Structure formats: structure tokens, C-alpha cells
Amino acid sequence: EKFPAVNQKPQAAXL
């Protein structure tokens, strides 16, 4: 969530 690029990935949301 902190990183914009990560927000693109559903798995990262999870983190």
C-alpha cells in the first residue's frame, strides 16, 4: 500500500 507500484499488484495489498 505504501508503494504506488505495489498497489498495482493484488498480492502486495495483502501485505
UniProtKB/Swiss-Prot annotation:
Its main location: secreted. Keywords: Blood coagulation cascade inhibiting toxin, Glycoprotein, Hemostasis impairing toxin, Secreted, Toxin. It is found in: Secreted. Glycosylated. GO terms for molecular function: toxin activity. Plasma. One of its GO terms (cellular component) is extracellular region. Binds to thrombin and inhibits blood coagulant activity. Does not inhibit the serine protease activity of thrombin or platelet aggregation activity. May bind to the heparin recognition exosite. Heteromer of subunit I and subunit II. This is Thrombin inhibitor subunit 1.
